[in-house]
Amino acid sequence: MSTTTVPELKQISREEAMRLGPGWSHSCHAMLYAANPGQLFGRIPMRFSVLMQMRFDGLLGFPGGFVDRRFWSLEDGLNRVLGLGLGGLRLTEADYLSSHLTEGPHRVVAHLYARQLTLEQLHAVEISAVHSRDHGLEVLGLVRVPLYTQKDRVGGFPNFLSNAFVSTAKYQLLFALKVLNMMPSEKLAEALASATEKQKKALEKLLPPSS
């Protein structure tokens, strides 16, 4: 199977991001993950559990949102949003992972934070999220990312990548999995290629045959 190159966005440092002018908006999101020694069906290693969420608009993304830099630091703004969607979890500058400039007409710098939890702590976050203020409103539920690929080369991570993601969320997921050494680059590219091929075939089925 041919592979697809993992897409890249322009990465800048936190310091560079802080020097951007008032014409830029800042979004802050958190990737919470835990090592998972479990096996699916007793034979497929789970390796890690990563949390994402289904949003009100039907798109997948990481917990977080926009931060108004006039009133909040990045971390304070992020924690404020997380409190509405997850509960009492608080991240710090030590959890900062990356900043990327988004493509398109809107000038947005996307900041990603990542924290490794124990599997028990991750499960506690899932339980807490159900009782948060935004559950069932802006947040429709947390999901765990399947970081495995089944024998058909589509089930698992490739199928997950075939979903619709908000803004830079899909790229941030791929970037974090790579830089945190959670999945080799070639495996990421293979999964992305399988997802792209699946989407292409689905689109071909919807389009009328050319005369």
From Swiss-Prot:
* Cell compartments where the protein resides: Nucleus
Name the Gene3D superfamilies on file. Nucleoside Triphosphate Pyrophosphohydrolase
Alphabetical UniProt keywords: Isopeptide bond, Nucleus, RNA-binding, Ubl conjugation
Q: Which GO terms describe its cellular component?
A: nucleus
One GO process term, biological-process aspect = negative regulation of double-strand break repair via nonhomologous end joining
* Ranges where the record places region Interaction with PXN: 118-205
Site description Required for interaction with TP53BP1, residues in chain: K10
SUPFAM superfamilies reported in the protein's UniProt record: Nudix
The question of whether RNA-binding is a record keyword is answered with yes
InterPro entries cross-referenced by the UniProt entry: NUDIX_hydrolase-like_dom_sf, NudT16
Q: What is its main location?
A: nucleus
**GO MF terms held by the record:** snoRNA binding
Sites of the Glycyl lysine isopeptide (Lys-Gly) (interchain with G-Cter in ubiquitin) crosslink: K10, K151
Q: Which Pfam families match?
A: Nudt16-like (PF22327)
Q: Does the keyword Ubl conjugation apply?
A: yes
> What does this protein's UniProt record list under function?
Key regulator of TP53BP1 required to stabilize TP53BP1 and regulate its recruitment to chromatin. In absence of DNA damage, interacts with the tandem Tudor-like domain of TP53BP1, masking the region that binds histone H4 dimethylated at 'Lys-20' (H4K20me2), thereby preventing TP53BP1 recruitment to chromatin and maintaining TP53BP1 localization to the nucleus.
Q: How does it assemble?
A: Homodimer. Interacts with TP53BP1 (via the Tudor-like domain); interaction is abolished following DNA damage and TP53BP1 phosphorylation by ATM. Interacts (via the cytoplasmic part) with SDC4. Interacts with TGFB1I1 and PXN.
Q: Which family is this protein grouped under?
A: Belongs to the Nudix hydrolase family. TIRR subfamily.
Spell out the protein name for this chain.
Answer: Tudor-interacting repair regulator protein
